[in-house]
């Protein structure tokens, strides 16, 4: 999950600990090793050396070289491989096995998230809410966040317009813009409008929490993975990052709790008077509607939404904008499409769907550089044997490599960025559905593959199209001279580098975007 998050992680030293605790950690690891059941016989790419007591070195190596190892192996092999990762052992399957893998009910994403992000510990409240049996977060994302799009598309566009002007300026001279940093701020503000509403989305303290909590979660989660699970409930109390994480959660509650209490009191008063309560167009309202009186962690739910939505959307927004800037002959056709479609239909989900060239550009960016080199990570709830005899032990991770997205047997000239690739695919009735950014299949698993696909991809697609449309109409963009491709590779992640920049200048709008139309 997170480019800037993961870069920030590397600036932290792993927590130093008393010798006694280290000795206990080693002892527990050895005991756990002895108690293991049947193990996979699959080759381990980065095995522990015979003289090593722990897998620490192997885990650190995977953090550094994981994407390169996975890409190198699956570019030449169509068979699975096992790695030691920072969560333990993980079997990576080739994408040719994705169809079978996605249908295995006992490969559980929630178990992976609960273990990897320590949902039982204070500070990881967002992941505790995600992993609740009611799956309230998933229901809100899949249902209301999609069905309510006609109500929030125009407010999203209005906020984007105002925010972009502040971040990118009004100078008509070429200037260097920190496009990743600006993109992160832009996505944070637009996401929070739909998450917590107009009142809180302008609260600078909340924006700071929304943007930085994910960094704190990733840092603390990684530090704790050094420890055996039995020691983590003790270790986190002594780590500075753990204190910071818990403080962010406390601050979040001080902002969110009064607002939800106000809304509940407002609703009760309206019901008592026999009048219709106000209906807010944000996830705070939709969580209340979906919970239907059942208890849930209000602040935890919002922190979960921010963690899931901000950094992944920022990565695709920045990646798509950089790719477009590197192909100047693409900008005028995109502007013409935006002017025509938005000029005729205004800011509606239907209009965003008609931005077919922009959609194709975004999907091609994701094909060239998926945000993870292996997706659909899940934990086995029982011993699992696949149809080819591959054994995945209970409690171990498995994932699917994204190798098919750059396979020359699937794509013509896969190494080349072709912005019209998926637009052409839409002309084929058999491929028109899967050619759209929001839809998934085995050839393009940038968002995973149903039922293991990212549930927030529908919102992300609309949000990013709105942001790109504003940028392209209002600004000229081009690469910074001498600025080569810069990706940040870490463990499973391949992200746009947080230092990514572009040259921008304000342009005179010949056809203003019609914010006065729905």
UniProtKB/Swiss-Prot annotation:
SUPFAM superfamilies: Cytochrome P450 (SSF48264). It catalyses: dihydro-ML-236C carboxylate + reduced [NADPH--hemoprotein reductase] + O2 = ML-236C carboxylate + oxidized [NADPH--hemoprotein reductase] + 2 H2O + H(+); ML-236C carboxylate + reduced [NADPH--hemoprotein reductase] + O2 = ML-236A carboxylate + oxidized [NADPH--hemoprotein reductase] + H2O + H(+). The gene is mlcC. CDD domains: CYP503A1-like. The keyword Membrane applies. Dihydro-ML-236C carboxylate monooxygenase; part of the gene cluster that mediates the biosynthesis of compactin, also known as mevastatin or ML-236B, and which acts as a potent competitive inhibitor of HMG-CoA reductase. Compactin biosynthesis is performed in two stages. The first stage is catalyzed by the nonaketide synthase mlcA, which belongs to type I polyketide synthases and catalyzes the iterative nine-step formation of the polyketide. Induction: Expression is induced at the beginning of the stationary phase, which is consistent with the timing of compactin production. Expression is controlled by the ML-236B/compactin cluster transcription regulator mlcR. Heme binds at residue 454. Keywords: Endoplasmic reticulum, Heme, Iron, Membrane, Metal-binding, Monooxygenase, Oxidoreductase, Signal-anchor, Transmembrane, Transmembrane helix. Its cofactor is heme. Belongs to the cytochrome P450 family. GO terms for molecular function: heme binding; iron ion binding; monooxygenase activity; oxidoreductase activity, acting on paired donors, with incorporation or reduction of molecular oxygen. GO terms for biological process: mycotoxin biosynthetic process. Compactin (also known as mevastatin or ML-236B) and the intermediary metabolites Ml-236C and ML-236A are inhibitors of HMG-CoA reductase involved in cholesterogenesis. Their hypocholesterolemic activity might be useful for lowering cholesterol levels in the blood and reduce artherosclerosis and coronary heart disease. This is Dihydro-ML-236C monooxygenase mlcC.
């Amino acid at each position: 999950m997170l480019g800037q998050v993961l870069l920030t992680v590397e600036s932290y030293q792993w927590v130093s600990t008393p010798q006694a605790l280290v000795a206990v950690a080693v002892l527990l690891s050895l005991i756990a090793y002895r108690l293991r059941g049947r193990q996979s016989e699959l080759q381990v790419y980065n095995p522990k050396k015979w003289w090593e007591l722990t897998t620490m070195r192997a885990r650190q190596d995977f953090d550094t070289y994981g994407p390169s190892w996975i890409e190198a192996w699956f570019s030449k092999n169509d068979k699975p491989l096992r790695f030691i990762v920072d969560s333990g052992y993980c079997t990576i399957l080739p994408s040719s096995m994705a169809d079978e893998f996605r249908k295995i009910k006992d490969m559980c994403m929630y178990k992976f998230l609960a273990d990897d992000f320590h949902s039982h510990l204070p500070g990881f409240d967002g992941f505790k809410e995600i992993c609740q049996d009611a799956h309230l977060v998933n229901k809100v994302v899949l249902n209301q966040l999609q069905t309510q799009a006609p109500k929030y598309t125009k407010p999203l566009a209005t906020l984007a317009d105002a925010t972009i002007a502040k971040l990118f300026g009004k100078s008509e001279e070429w200037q260097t813009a920190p496009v990743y940093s600006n993109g992160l701020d832009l996505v944070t503000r637009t996401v929070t409008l739909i998450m917590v509403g107009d009142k809180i989305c302008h609260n600078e303290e909340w924006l700071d929490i929304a943007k930085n909590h994910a960094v704190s979660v990733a840092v603390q989660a990684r530090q704790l993975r050094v420890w055996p699970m039995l020691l983590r409930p003790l270790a986190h109390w002594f780590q500075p990052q753990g204190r910071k994480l818990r403080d962010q959660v406390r601050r979040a509650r001080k902002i969110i709790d009064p607002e939800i209490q106000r809304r509940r009191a407002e609703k009760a008063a309206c019901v008592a008077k026999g009048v219709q309560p106000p209906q807010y167009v944000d996830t705070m309202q939709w969580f209340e509607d979906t919970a239907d009186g059942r208890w849930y962690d209000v602040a935890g739910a919002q922190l979960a939404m921010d963690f899931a939505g901000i950094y992944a959307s920022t990565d695709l927004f920045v990646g798509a904008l950089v790719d477009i800037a590197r192909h100047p002959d693409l900008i005028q056709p995109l502007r013409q499409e935006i002017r025509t479609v938005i000029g005729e239909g205004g800011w509606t989900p239907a209009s965003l769907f008609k931005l077919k060239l922009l959609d194709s550009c975004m999907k091609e960016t994701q094909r060239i550089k998926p945000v993870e080199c292996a997706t659909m990570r899940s934990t086995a709830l029982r011993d699992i044997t696949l149809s080819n005899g591959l054994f995945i032990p209970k409690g171990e991770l498995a994932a699917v490599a994204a190798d098919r997205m750059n396979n020359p047997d699937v794509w013509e000239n896969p190494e080349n960025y072709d912005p019209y690739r998926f637009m052409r695919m839409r002309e084929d009735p058999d491929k028109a559905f899967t050619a759209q950014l929001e839809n998934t299949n085995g050839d393009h698993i940038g968002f995973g593959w149903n039922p293991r696909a990212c549930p927030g991809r529908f919102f992300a697609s609309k949000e990013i199209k709105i942001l790109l449309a504003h940028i392209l109409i209002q600004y000229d963009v081009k690469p910074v001279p001498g600025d080569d491709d810069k990706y940040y590779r870490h463990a499973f992640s391949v992200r746009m580098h947080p230092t990514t920049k572009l040259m921008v200048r304000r342009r005179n709008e010949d056809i203003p975007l019609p914010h006065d139309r729905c």
